């Protein structure tokens, strides 16, 4: 395997996943105890992967430490599936997630500078919960419009978004602008793990992951409800 992005080397394949055939199951938004507001140790996140086959993308607040710990533990266990090193970064305009990072990005930069730093690493940018009104850290429509040409992905399903229409607005925006969508539980407690995930074809790099998303299936459960397959849009 080459670096963190897995440009070389085999990818772990999941036979008989919910998308059929060989898929990788990814919960694209999970917080570990490396985020001060989360109660989930990395070892519990690892156990979810071992028991359910759902690999969490740990997006801790302003640090990559949680996803680095997960990558280390999976390496110790002999896994060759590439772990996505990620961080949910608080910018001056709102939160942005960097995926496939090789270096941690500091908070409190402008959104534009944060996006530059993400892309300078060959990484991908994801806007989480963009229309969620109970958070003060969502970018909103105006922020999305200003940054549209520099955004790679939009979070279309977030289990912690309480108003269903706000997830729908995110998916509608992504479709309007031609952006792939992701899905995540935004888990901060153990009970939330495994609520929402993507079933994607195997990938070995950020660009391969990006290209795999149109083929992904989404399994979504709002907090407290049963997971169910949904149409991407």
Language-model features, listed with the residues they occupy:
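Short beta-strand/loop segments at the ligand-binding rim of alpha/beta enzyme cores
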Residues: 120-130
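Charged catalytic cores and adjacent phosphate/nucleic-acid-binding surfaces used
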Residues: 1-38, 42-47, 52, 68-71, ...
């Amino acid at each position: 395997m080459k670096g963190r992005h897995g440009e070389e080397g085999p990818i772990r394949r999941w036979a008989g996943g919910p998308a059929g055939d060989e898929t990788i199951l990814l919960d694209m938004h999970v917080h570990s105890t490396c985020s001060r507001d989360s109660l989930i140790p990395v070892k519990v996140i690892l156990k979810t992967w071992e028991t359910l086959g759902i690999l969490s993308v740990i997006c801790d607040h302003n640090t990559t430490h949680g996803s680095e710990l997960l990558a280390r533990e999976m390496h110790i266990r002999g896994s060759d599936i590439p772990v996505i090193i990620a961080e949910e970064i608080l910018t001056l305009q709102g939160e942005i997630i960097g995926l496939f990072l090789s270096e941690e990005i500091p908070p409190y930069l402008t959104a534009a500078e944060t996006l530059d730093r993400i892309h300078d690493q060959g990484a991908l940018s994801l806007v989480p919960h963009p229309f969620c009104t109970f958070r003060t850290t969502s970018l909103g429509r105006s922020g999305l419009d200003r940054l549209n040409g520099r955004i790679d992905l939009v979070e279309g399903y977030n289990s912690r978004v309480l108003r269903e229409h706000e997830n729908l607005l995110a998916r509608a925006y992504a479709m309007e602008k031609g952006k792939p969508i992701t899905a995540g539980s935004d888990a901060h407690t153990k009970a939330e793990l495994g609520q929402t995930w993507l079933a994607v074809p195997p990938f070995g790099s950020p660009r391969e992951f990006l290209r795999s998303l149109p083929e992904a299936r989404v399994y979504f459960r709002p907090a407290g409800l049963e997971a169910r397959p949904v149409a991407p849009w």
